[in-house]
């Protein structure tokens, strides 16, 4: 249990930060799910728009420290590869 005021404040800050980070992580997952749905539907135009949104959201999470930079880059790279594969199949 926190005994001094600084430790109590740290607990409050951590609780707020955890809530914000959870929301950000959830938001990233939502955009990734939208991209997955667009890929499953096979619609290249919708998938490209969803990819741009997902990439933006992932990089925002990276900049906020919610996701490790390498993880964000890896996910974006894999999404781009899947989008490219869909484009090539459609062409």
Swiss-Prot record:
SUPFAM superfamilies: Ribosomal protein S20. Keywords: Ribonucleoprotein, Ribosomal protein, RNA-binding, rRNA-binding. One of its GO terms (molecular function) is structural constituent of ribosome. InterPro entries: Ribosomal_bS20, Ribosomal_bS20_sf. It holds the Pfam family Ribosomal_S20p. One of its GO terms (cellular component) is cytosol. GO terms for biological process: translation. The keyword RNA-binding applies. It comes from the Bacteria. HAMAP family: Ribosomal_bS20 (MF_00500). Binds directly to 16S ribosomal RNA. Belongs to the bacterial ribosomal protein bS20 family. This is Small ribosomal subunit protein bS20. It comes from Caulobacter sp. (strain K31). The lineage of its organism: Bacteria, Pseudomonadati, Pseudomonadota, Alphaproteobacteria, Caulobacterales. The gene is rpsT.
């Amino acid at each position: 249990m926190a005994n001094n005021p600084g430790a109590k404040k740290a607990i409050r800050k951590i609780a707020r930060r955890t809530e914000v980070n959870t929301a950000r992580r959830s938001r990233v997952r939502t955009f990734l799910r939208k991209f997955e749905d667009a890929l499953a539907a096979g619609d290249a135009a919708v998938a490209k728009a969803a990819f741009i949104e997902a990439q933006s959201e992932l990089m925002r999470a990276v900049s906020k420290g919610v996701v490790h930079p390498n993880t964000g880059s890896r996910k974006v790279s894999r999404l781009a590869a899947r989008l490219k594969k869909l484009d090539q199949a459609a062409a």
